[in-house]
Amino acid sequence: TLKEQGKLEEAIEAYNKALAIKPDHASAQHIVSSLTGKTTTSAPRKYVENLFDGYAKKFEQSLVGNLEYKTPKMLTDVVVKEHGGGLLGSVLDLGCGTGLIGSEIKDFCTNLEGIDLSKEMLKLANAKNVYDQLSHSDIIEYLSNEELNFDYFISTDVFIYVGELSDVFRLIKWKNKRAGKLVFSTEHTELDGFQLEKTGRYSHSKTY
């Protein structure tokens, strides 16, 4: 694509032409925002669904095989060390994808559940047989509508598609029946708050 070739001005022009024809095209809106420096609160649901439905079959080979992706193992090690021994209890994987962190953390859980926007990713996660329950849902939708009774909420490279995280924090704090903990990874920015990058992903500052 023009974006992948680094032809950003041409890419913006092409996406704006698409928006002139279909103004409500969420994916095009998101990409134009990312390329023009406009920070929105989150990536549109349809954009994320389409991105990962299309990426699902080559996701693990791309990340684990080609990029030696280690975040799930690192995050699991952090949680287990912080917990200080024994089982973690009930864990909810927010944006479980193909189940990479589920495979790492399963043996430390009494109950492991996962949610994701991509049906294709969920199929691959289900095939691993590490989750006690999987749900096709948006994070805010799930946290708002479901009963929450978890010891840990984990999220691996998912908040890079959610800029404004205050609703996530608020819902977990207000609705969870236990004194649960949230452990997650983000991409870093030196700017205040959060920023939508040209990649279409969000970065967050440490202070945020």
Predicted features by range, described:
Residues 61-77:
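Conserved SAM-binding loop and adjacent beta-strand
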Residues 166-179:
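A short glycine-rich, Lys/Arg-flanked "PGG" loop and its adjoining helix->strand segment in the class I
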Residues 179-187:
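Conserved beta-strand signature within the Rossmann-like core of class I S-adenosyl-L-methionine
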Residues 193-208:
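Acceptor-substrate binding/catalytic loop of class I
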Residues 154:
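A conserved beta-strand element that flanks and buttresses the S-adenosyl-L-methionine
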Residues 92, 98-142:
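Class I SAM-dependent methyltransferase SAM/SAH-binding core
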